Amino acid sequence: MRVRARLEQLFKREEGGIRRNIPRPDLIQACVDRHEALVSQCGALATWTPPESTGRSPLDTLIVRRPESESKIDWDAPNNIPVDPETFTMLVDDALATLHDAEEVFVTDRVIGADPTHAMPVTTVSNRALTALFTLNMFRPIPDDIDKSCFADKPFLLLVCPWDKLDPERYEGRLRVDPRLGHTSTMAVAMDFDDRIGVVFGSAYCGSVKKLMFTVMNFLLPFENILPLHCSANEGPDGDVALLLGLSGTGKTTLSADPDRSLLGDDEHSWGPNGVANFENGCYAKLIDLDPQKEPEIHHACFHKADYRKHGAIIENAMMYPDGTFDLHDDRLTPNSRGSYPLQYLHNIKPESMGGHPRVILFLTADANGVLPPVSKLTRAQAMLWFLMGYTSKLAGTETGVTEPKSVFSRFFG
């Protein structure tokens, strides 16, 4: 496909406008100058997405089906939707063409994973400054010893055009028909595990970027004898690590932000020979009904007062009044309002985001039918069964079309 060679040509274009790894304050300023976000009263950036982009869209999330990985993916699973290589090439071509036409292109070079032995280098290229800022919040700086990583020579490339839309006629018969539109979908979140390329096109929900990379790590790490987990993690004063597994909205971020325990991370981790390590550099917390008395750490991280060029928290789809204050109880836009912020905005964190092997594992289940007791202590066999079964619920707003809790069996709480 020679995508990377074409991208290098783009980076060298005569008209310029390529802004690669620019300082964080300059990136925040670009978000404001380009009207991608507004400055709130506290200094955080407020942004809003189209109604079709207030949550993840599993039906538009696609995996390239190639002979190399054919037998390694459960294609019978409802969320593993295949796309053929030709269609994916079309998506890449459209993304590159869109980026070529952009006056400014924002590029960040980061990694996924705090453990340097399996940190994944990822270059994100977007025509939106806010996407680049989101990657600074959520993806980690490149460590000095990145050469130790099993992925050091296998970097991932992510092309993101969140506000542009695909031509439905061009993709007729290739992508699904979206019943809301009455024609072929104009959105795709697609990934090629073999060529290590991802495309986010038409989804302005910031979570699409982070979840694409989480999916990539979910696929690649088991082949390195590393277990990827959808969980938060914290550590007690004696070094005891706890994992809290659960789907989006079940309380991982809230429960792991404990003033008496150091936070490793709130959503995505690996568990390998060295112990537990956070994938991310920040948090992407649900904000609906956030109470500063009950959740002071998260509230402070999002809404502490600072000069906006030094703030950089992203408040997504929350109701903001003309005076720049927020009403976090107003869910008219979506019950899935979010706040993205770096871990360093929290008071009690473990900076290296790595810990030993967990002593306690908690499964957080949103039980829509009330069939489970509030708390259960599981035997080892029961825990293994529960991990494999993953009974829980999808919660309102976390995915497009989910308006009330919906029971689901999500294997491994992924």
Q: Where are these predicted regions, by residue range?
A:
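Glycine- and acidic
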Residues: 77, 194-202, 241, 411-413
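Short secondary-structure capping/junction motifs at helix and strand boundaries
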Residues: 102-109, 223-228, 263-264
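Charged, amphipathic alpha-helical linker segments immediately N-terminal to NTP-binding catalytic cores
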Residues: 156-220
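Short alpha-helical segments and helix-capping/turn motifs at coil-helix boundaries
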Residues: 88-98, 142-143, 183-185, 338-350
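N-terminal accessory targeting/assembly segments
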Residues: 1-156
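Conserved glycine(s) of the Walker
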Residues: 250-252
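Short, acidic Gly/Pro/Ser/Thr-rich loop/turn segments
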Residues: 115, 207, 368-372
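Glycine-rich, often acidic-flanked micro-motifs
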Residues: 2, 6-41, 52, 222, ...
